[in-house]
């Protein structure tokens, strides 16, 4: 079997494996009492990751350059990055729900590359002079890895919104992994200051549990008091969520934050590397090409997300909505500009 035939077989095999893996994750989510299904889903994602990596390796050997020169190759590299980040996120969160959201995206990318792109765009061709540079690997690969991480982080934020049903659940400590959650009006206080969350979720009632510190002589004694507050629509809706859902929401919020925190510096490095390469190739660090403009917009969206979480202390629904919007922005930056826009980065397909 020559390398071209191997690539054709691997791209179809990758699609088939991802499709079956998606079904396994969905069945596992619908029937959580089947642990074998969940294990098969993880194995399927690992097989797809290896299959795509082998395809890219064969492409590299055949063409003699890093396989990121056209849309077909970048789509497969993106899907490989998503499956890789998925495996990291799933291992960190210990939740198979991650695959319910990430697998359809990875499968859709592979399907688009395999079944939709014209055959002449799937063939490796000699590099144009502008791409004959070591910056091809240094810039494009880092950008694609950042897209992968940001997409997975955004998908986990969308999963958080689905799990919480869009309710305003405020999570404490998820940014630094302390654990614990609270709804509006529920928190732990010590001497008037926020300290930590209880080991068990609060009793659902019309009030909230509060831990206050009272000074008795030379020692501080924590006293657990039950206070009542007027019932609000937010509390009424959040009380329908089980502790299991809240715990899962906390995990998704935490992992989403960490994955986006990984993708953002990669995006920053990729943009800087691209500016240096642009200066070498075109004589200008920044020319407001549509791709450059949307890369800057993407950077600003996720910079706002991290700023809101780190500096402003946002957690829960608001940053999740911001991250979910970032998912759309990343796709516009990566695919929309390339296919529909005009500029130095356009692939010239469709229009």
UniProtKB/Swiss-Prot annotation:
- Give the main location: membrane
Location within or outside the cell = Cellular thylakoid membrane
UniProt cross-references to Pfam families, sorted A to Z: Cytochrom_C_asm
| GO BP annotations, alphabetical order | cytochrome complex assembly
Looking up InterPro entries in the UniProt record yields:
Cyt_c_assembly (IPR002541), Cyt_c_biogenesis_CcsA (IPR017562), Cyt_c_biogenesis_CcsA/CcmC (IPR045062)
**GO annotations of cellular component type:** plasma membrane-derived thylakoid membrane
Q: Where do transmembrane segments lie in this chain?
A: 17-37, 38-58, 68-88, 97-117, 143-163, 259-279, 286-306, 320-340
- What membrane topology term does the record carry? Multi-pass membrane protein
The family note in this entry says: Belongs to the CcmF/CycK/Ccl1/NrfE/CcsA family.
Query: Subunit arrangement?
Result: May interact with ccs1.
Task of the protein:
Required during biogenesis of c-type cytochromes (cytochrome c6 and cytochrome f) at the step of heme attachment.
Recorded hits in HAMAP family, A to Z, give: CytC_CcsA (MF_01391)
Official protein name in the record: Cytochrome c biogenesis protein CcsA
Q: Which organism is it from?
A: Nostoc sp. (strain PCC 7120 / SAG 25.82 / UTEX 2576)
Q: Which gene encodes it?
A: ccsA
